[in-house]
Design a protein with these regions (language model features):
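Non-catalytic cap/lid and distal C-terminal segments of serine-dependent acyl enzymes
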Residues: 1-176
Length: 176
């Protein structure tokens, strides 16, 4: 109901991308490097295939803005897309996100894992175009997490992501 009017007026559209977490992040029986490879393929699908397809389907004007939104590992995907491809995604909303992907991919031991580990790559110089991101709209990154007993990892990760963004001088809006 909160966005019903915007949807009805055609000002906002929602698209849902299927996840491949079972073959990537959550594939516990698969080597971390292979999980990172699958994650990179998914990232490329979202940014190089799905996003352009959404714009094409709608005959989008040049100023059309895409936002990525997700919950749990989807929040990680949304924020990762925004940080790595700010020219494609104007913003991201992460809800109860799990941003410390070392629990899925291991430590950022190689460039492929590092490219998909925002808490790690935000700390590395030259991996994210911070100047481009800093020019983005205020609050183009929104992070939210609840405080229930089941939110433990998400609450810790959400705070860590907000801190990492702030340390880089990137605007973030945090709600916990």
């Amino acid at each position: 109901d909160a966005i019903a009017q915007l949807l009805n007026e055609g000002k906002v559209q929602l698209f849902c991308a299927d996840s491949i977490d079972a073959e990537s992040l959550l594939a516990g029986d698969t080597a971390p490097r292979r999980r990172a490879e699958m994650q990179e393929k998914y990232f490329n699908y979202l940014t190089s295939e799905l996003a352009p397809r959404i714009l094409t389907l709608n005959g989008a004007k040049k100023d059309t803005l895409l936002w990525a939104v997700g919950v749990d590992t989807g929040a990680y995907q949304a924020v990762n897309c925004r940080l790595r491809r700010p020219e494609v995604f104007a913003g991201a909303i992460g809800l109860s996100g799990l941003y410390d992907v070392s629990r899925f991919l291991g430590n950022a031991a190689d460039d492929l894992v590092l490219r998909n580990a925002p808490l790690a790559y935000l700390a590395e110089e030259g991996l994210v175009d911070k100047k481009l991101l800093a020019k983005a709209e205020e609050n183009a990154l929104l992070l939210c997490a609840g405080q229930g007993s089941y939110e433990g990892d998400a609450l810790v990760d959400t705070q860590a992501m907000a801190d990492a963004l702030t340390d880089c001088g990137l605007p973030v809006h945090l709600e916990v």
